[in-house]
């Protein structure tokens, strides 16, 4: 079932985040190892107001286990969502005025992360999470959803295009190029229920 995440899901969500964003976790935590980053990521997921907060996550649960996650939020909320994270990065790196590259256009509901446990890949869970998120966004009156896909991951791009996302432009994040894909919500209505 696709459901809203709970605070206690953090320990299962964090490895999925790490799997999806890899070394970006170091930038988001101001650390240099996964061992250092993991407790900070768990804190982010458990927090009430953060880009990675459980409030921004939908999860796929099977057999009592979280096997997939999709994280999304409105781009205009990032200045508030990132406040505490930027303070943590600043403190850990001992630098002032840390900035994070802009990942989404202001009008977009942005998909930050989509990740499925390796043992459950190829079973349609990524598609189900995407469709659940799009259904959730439609019910909230959101007009457009966007995401960045690594240009080195053509299979991920195919998944997004299969669901209906379209290429809009190239975006550079942390000196790496990503294809920026968008989905106008009015285009399609999904029946995936989120509980």
Where are these predicted regions, by residue range?
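A short helix-loop-beta-strand connector motif used in the catalytic cores of GNAT acetyltransferases and
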Residues: 46-59, 76-80, 110
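Conserved acetyl-CoA-binding loop-helix of GNAT-fold acetyltransferases
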Residues: 116, 122-139, 158-162
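Conserved acyl-donor/pantetheine-binding loop and adjacent beta-alpha core of acyl/acetyltransferases
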Residues: 74-109
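A short beta-loop-alpha structural element at the N-terminal edge
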Residues: 1-15, 23-27
């Amino acid at each position: 079932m696709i459901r809203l995440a709970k605070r206690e899901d953090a320990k299962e969500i964090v490895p999925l985040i790490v799997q999806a964003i890899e070394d970006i976790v170091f930038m988001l935590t101001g650390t240099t190892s996964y061992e250092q980053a993991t407790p900070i990521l768990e804190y982010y997921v458990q927090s009430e107001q953060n880009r990675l907060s459980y409030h921004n996550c939908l999860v796929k649960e099977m057999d009592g286990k979280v096997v997939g996650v999709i994280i999304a939020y409105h781009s205009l909320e990032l200045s508030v969502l990132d406040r505490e994270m930027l303070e943590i990065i600043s403190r850990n790196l001992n630098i002032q005025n840390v900035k994070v590259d802009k990942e989404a256009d202001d009008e977009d509901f942005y998909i930050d992360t989509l990740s499925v446990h390796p043992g459950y890949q190829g079973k349609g869970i990524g598609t189900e999470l995407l469709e659940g998120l799009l259904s959730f966004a439609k019910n909230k009156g959101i007009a457009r959803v966007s995401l960045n896909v690594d240009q080195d991951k053509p299979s991920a791009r195919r998944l997004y295009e299969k669901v209906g996302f379209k290429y809009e432009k190239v975006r550079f994040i942390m000196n790496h190029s990503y294809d920026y894909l968008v989905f106008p919500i009015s285009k399609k209505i999904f029946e995936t229920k989120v509980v």
